[in-house]
């Protein structure tokens, strides 16, 4: 049965830098906390596990190599016990979870998101379609069958996008066309405008993401929009600085950027710079009616006879296989990664994975 009114949460916290196990434990802690607070939904930032590698914007190639190796070693596969523990936590708390993580698949990393249901099933698995600028040195592109965002659930039509995908007009159009009602605008960690240095444009700083891009997404799509954001501490600055380089000493410019917006773009909540934890919101899906009755860009307020978007969701692989009948074998990335397999409790597990 559809749930139209419920409590949700957005995470604004410091990740477990370069620490897969620590990141999984912290993720489960937040899922437990959200569940105990009565939430039906909790949203995590972009590549929450094992943290966003902001150092890639500031280091040389040689400086990056030890950090990149460690980052890859602590990225997470979707068909892994770490992911299954997170899925079990969602099931134990009967909660929907939007999780951003650095996914390792064979030898390539992806800026990935999953939407996990209250039964522990992975409802949606997606990858950022195009890493941003220097991110291309760390991550690969999403494919045709890994970029769809919106899922039909009992808490509404829930969508997820990473970072600057949230200002991509084509992806917004695609999400609107799916009737999105609740959106996760997942952001990484990067500094506020206090750190802007000419000629770097303001686009590349956190304030426009929090206070322009995210509310614009809400008002253009008429959706409840949760914007989880990572944070940094003095210790985090040290961990994310290569050996031989003097670390920054003031993490405050990286903090306080998470937001939650109503479907009309008005602000629900923003944290103080020293806040670390969950931001809460009481969602009422029926509020979307009055925003979408004014502007539904997938329905009464669009002209598909004049403007249309072509979307290709076919999987493309380097190798095309023939099946036993001589036809082309077809399977999805989801199937290849084992996401269609049912989630089972680990042997001897009788209690929730509360850490």
UniProtKB/Swiss-Prot annotation:
Stored Gene3D superfamilies: Carbon-nitrogen hydrolase (3.60.110.10)
Inducing factors: By cyanide.
pH dependence: Optimum pH is 6-7. Active fom pH 6 to pH 8.5.
Molecular function terms, GO-annotated: cyanide hydratase activity; nitrilase activity
GO biological process, one term: cyanide catabolic process
CN hydrolase domain mapped to chain residues: 6-285
Broad EC category: lyase
EC number: 4.2.1.66
Keyword hit for Lyase: yes
Keywords attached to this entry: Hydrolase, Lyase
InterPro entries to which the protein is assigned, alphabetical: C-N_Hydrolase, C-N_Hydrolase_sf, CN_hydrolase, Nitrilase/CN_hydratase_CS, Nitrilases_CHs
Substrates-to-products reaction catalysed: formamide = hydrogen cyanide + H2O
Active site location: 46 (proton acceptor), 128, 163 (nucleophile)
Binding partners and assembly: Oligomer of dimers, forming left-handed helical fibers.
Reported function: Catalyzes the hydration of cyanide to formamide. Degradation of cyanide may be important for plant pathogenic fungi in infection of cyanogenic plants.
Family: Belongs to the carbon-nitrogen hydrolase superfamily. Nitrilase family.
Protein name (database record): Cyanide hydratase
């Amino acid at each position: 049965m559809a749930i139209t009114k419920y409590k949700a949460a957005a995470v604004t916290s410091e990740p477990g830098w370069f620490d897969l196990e620590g990141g999984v434990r912290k993720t489960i802690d937040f899922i437990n906390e959200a569940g105990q607070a009565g939430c039906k939904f909790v949203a995590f930032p972009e590549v929450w596990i094992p943290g966003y590698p902001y150092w890639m914007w500031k280091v040389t190639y040689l400086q990056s190599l030890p950090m990149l190796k460690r980052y890859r070693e602590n990225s997470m596969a979707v068909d892994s016990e770490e992911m299954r523990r997170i899925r079990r936590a969602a099931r134990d708390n009967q909660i929907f979870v939007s999780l951003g993580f650095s996914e390792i698949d064979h030898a390539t990393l992806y800026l990935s998101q999953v939407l996990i249901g209250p039964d522990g099933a992975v409802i949606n698995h997606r990858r950022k379609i195009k890493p941003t600028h220097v991110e291309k040195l760390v991550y690969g592109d999403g494919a045709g069958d890994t970029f769809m965002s919106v899922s039909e659930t009992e808490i509404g039509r829930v969508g997820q996008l990473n970072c600057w995908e949230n200002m991509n007009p084509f992806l917004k159009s695609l999400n609107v066309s799916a009737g999105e009602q609740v959106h996760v605008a997942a952001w990484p960690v990067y500094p506020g405008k206090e750190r802007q240095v000419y000629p770097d444009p303001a686009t590349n700083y956190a304030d426009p993401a929090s206070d322009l891009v995210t509310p614009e997404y809400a008002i253009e799509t008429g959706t409840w929009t949760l914007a989880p954001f990572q944070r940094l501490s003095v210790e985090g600055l040290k961990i994310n600085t290569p050996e031989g380089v003097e670390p920054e000493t003031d993490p405050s410019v990286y903090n306080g950027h998470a937001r939650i917006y109503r479907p009309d773009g008005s602000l629900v909540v923003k944290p103080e710079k020293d806040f670390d934890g969950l931001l809460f919101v009481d969602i009422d899906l029926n509020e979307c009616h009055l925003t979408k009755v004014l502007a539904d860009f997938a329905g009464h307020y669009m002209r598909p006879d004049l403007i249309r978007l072509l979307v290709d969701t076919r999987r493309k692989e380097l190798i095309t296989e023939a099946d036993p009948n001589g036809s082309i074998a077809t399977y999805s990335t989801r199937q290849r990664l084992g996401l269609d397999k049912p989630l089972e409790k680990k042997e001897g597990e009788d209690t929730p994975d509360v850490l």
